[in-house]
From Swiss-Prot:
It is an enzyme of class 2 (transferase). Keywords: Cytoplasm, Methyltransferase, S-adenosyl-L-methionine, Transferase, tRNA processing. CDD domains: TrmD-like (cd18080). GO terms for biological process: tRNA N1-guanine methylation. PANTHER family: TRNA (GUANINE-N(1)-)-METHYLTRANSFERASE. Belongs to the RNA methyltransferase TrmD family. It comes from the Bacteria. S-adenosyl-L-methionine binds at residues 113, 137-142. Its EC number is 2.1.1.228. This is tRNA (guanine-N(1)-)-methyltransferase. It catalyses: guanosine(37) in tRNA + S-adenosyl-L-methionine = N(1)-methylguanosine(37) in tRNA + S-adenosyl-L-homocysteine + H(+).
């Protein structure tokens, strides 16, 4: 996979040189290029922003440097359009499913906006050469797109074959099956007067699997009930449904619903 990141603060992306993503780059599992947007300006001050038409606070990123920067990363002979991700609080909310979609692509480009954002004409212009996906990390505002891009790059790149040492670990993480991950424990089994759940010492793999599944369901119901409404009850077994009933959920018209919301 090839990834290109465009930013006015290329040094901000230095953490991508570390840990698993940095090692994946060294091992040739992914190609990651960081570009300085100011290198595509044409004035001596290397200006990348200007005042907004219509008035208002802040500055807007100029279109021409962005057009030149984006054009520089397009491969004319590519079989498919690269995906252009534009971090924006007005974009679709990034999640694990989107990370999986992006991990299946061959070329991703990330446009790190600053100030009040990038001139909207750039987004429209880019659609001819890119599949454009404005993307948000959540319902809050950051100073720029770099933090969001680092999160999205890591969430996506770690799904590539060979990046994570044990691929089975990817199957047991939060959100992989639409639920939060179960709690985990390590040695010692007794710590400051607190013991780990006894079932984890039983050696009974079926009981351990059931315990972990139950904890996933309880934790999701407590912390992220919104995820349960997106879950297909058809994939749940009787034990799953029993745990959810204890947590205050029933299946109504094919949707998991809080019992407190029923008349």
């Amino acid at each position: 996979m090839r990834l290109d990141v465009i930013s006015i603060f290329p040094d901000y992306l230095a953490p991508l040189e570390l840990s698993l993503i940095g090692k994946a780059r060294q091992d040739g599992l992914l190609e990651l290029n960081v570009h300085d947007l100011r290198a595509f300006t044409t004035d001596r001050h290397r200006t990348v922003d200007d005042t907004p038409y219509g008035g208002g606070a802040g500055m807007v990123m100029k279109p021409e440097p962005w057009a030149l920067a984006l054009a520089s990363v397009v491969e004319p002979a590519a079989k498919s359009k690269p995906v252009l991700i534009v971090p924006s609080p007005a974009g679709e909310v990034f999640n694990q499913r989107i990370a999986e979609e992006l991990a299946a692509e061959s070329h991703l480009v990330f446009a790190c906006g600053r100030y009040e954002g990038i001139d909207e004409r750039v987004v429209d212009w880019a659609r001819e050469s890119f599949t454009v996906r404005p993307m948000s990390l959540g319902d809050y505002v950051l100073n720029g797109g770099e933090v969001a891009v680092m999160a999205m790059v890591e969430a996506t790149a770690r799904l590539l074959p060979g990046v994570v040492g044990n691929p089975d670990s990817l199957l047991e993480e939060s959100h992989q099956d639409g639920l939060l991950e179960y709690p985990v424990y390590t040695k010692p089994s007794a710590w400051r007067g607190v013991d780990i759940p006894a079932v984890l010492l039983s050696g009974n793999h079926a009981k351990i699997a059931r315990f972990r599944r139950d904890e996933q369901l309880r934790r999701t119901a407590q912390r992220r009930p919104d995820l349960l409404t997106q879950l297909d009850p058809a994939i749940l077994d009787r034990a799953d449904l029993a745990v959810l009933r204890e947590s205050g959920y029933l299946t109504v018209d094919g949707v998991l619903t809080r019992t407190s919301e029923l008349g």
